[in-house]
């Protein structure tokens, strides 16, 4: 066995495997926590939304550990790791899933919304993995990071989301090589549309709805969160390098160079003026922050703004 072909310690067949999941209060994270429980694992739930996180923990079981933390703060993620080790003694898997979206064209998008998207989606992944890394090395564990289909398909008016997810994929490609010598596996999740609060809140933007309407049928399809969770947990068990949702996404990934050729962008180019006009209507009605975030993230941002005053 060469240095480039490391053997990894198996973990999924053990009587106990501890899986830390960020963004676990809802959507993909919540569904994954339930699936981990169904497969006999021990989920640790992390989110910055305290009330829905506590409710989700009760659904997983009365003794389920949950930690209210903002992934953009490295110290907070170190505390999550310390609390997990105090309760469970180990961390076998980390699913860096927490994410938000910003929506709006370059000329009008709220800069704070754009920045927040990058902070959560990029630095949040870094902080999560960095904090848990010593524990993962101890267990020869596995990391899965959520890059989404937007890591290689970059729609207009979602530049922050696309840029952040492209960064996540790049981080994963680098880290996979770095961590192999430490017997830690790393996978990147490339998921299309999943019925989650993030997607539901996006549908409140007429411009977002128009954007999705430009996409051909297969690219506009949605998976349910439970179906997504089954694919994700199966990927964890296999220590997969990449997890595809749906499976045909791997074909699109292989053809990624074609996605931004002129012929492929033609329909988006035609729709772009209408998408921008719809965005501006929302901007006039609600302001830049409201148009750039869904209601959940907007409320979080407003709360943080009040706390700073």
Where are these regions (language model features)?
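SDR active-site lid
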Residues: 181-249
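Residue(s) in the substrate-gating loop at a strand-loop-helix junction
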Residues: 148
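Conserved glycine-rich Rossmann-like NAD(P)H-binding loop of the short-chain dehydrogenase/reductase
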Residues: 39-55
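The beta1-alpha1 cofactor-binding region of Rossmann-like NAD(H)/NADP(H)-dependent oxidoreductases
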Residues: 68-79, 111
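Substrate-binding pocket helix/loop in short-chain dehydrogenase/reductase
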Residues: 105-106, 110-115
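Active-site helix of classical SDR
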Residues: 129, 164
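Conserved glycine-rich cofactor-binding loop
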Residues: 25-26
């Amino acid at each position: 066995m060469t240095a480039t072909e490391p053997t990894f310690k198996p973990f999924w067949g053990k009587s106990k495997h501890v899986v830390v999941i960020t963004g676990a209060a809802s959507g993909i994270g919540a569904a994954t926590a339930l699936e981990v429980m169904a497969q006999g694992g021990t989920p640790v739930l992390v989110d910055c939304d305290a009330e829905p996180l506590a409710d989700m923990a009760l659904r997983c079981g009365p003794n389920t550990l949950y930690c209210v933390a903002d992934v953009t703060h490295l110290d907070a993620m170190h505390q999550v790791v310390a609390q997990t080790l105090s309760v469970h003694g180990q961390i076998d898997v980390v699913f860096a899933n927490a994410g938000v979206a910003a929506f709006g064209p370059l000329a009008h998008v709220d800069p704070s919304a754009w920045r927040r998207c990058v902070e959560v989606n990029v630095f949040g992944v870094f902080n999560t993995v960095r904090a848990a890394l010593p524990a993962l090395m101890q267990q020869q564990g596995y990391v899965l990071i959520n890059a989404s289909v937007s890591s290689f398909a970059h729609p207009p008016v979602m530049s922050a989301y696309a840029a952040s997810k492209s960064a996540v994929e790049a981080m994963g490609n680098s880290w996979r090589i770095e961590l192999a010598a430490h017997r830690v596996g790393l996978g990147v999740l490339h998921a299309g549309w999943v019925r989650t609060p993030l997607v539901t809140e996006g549908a409140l933007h007429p411009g977002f709805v128009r954007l999705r309407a430009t996409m051909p049928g297969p690219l506009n399809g949605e998976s349910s969160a439970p179906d997504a969770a089954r694919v994700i947990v199966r990927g964890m068990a296999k220590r997969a390098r990449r997890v595809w949702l749906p499976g045909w996404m791997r074909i699109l990934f292989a053809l990624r160079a074609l996605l931004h050729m002129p012929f492929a962008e033609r329909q988006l180019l035609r729709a772009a003026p209408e998408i921008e006009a719809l965005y501006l209507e929302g901007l006039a009605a609600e302001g830049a922050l409201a148009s750039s975030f869904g209601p959940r993230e907007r409320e979080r941002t407003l709360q943080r703004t009040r706390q700073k005053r």
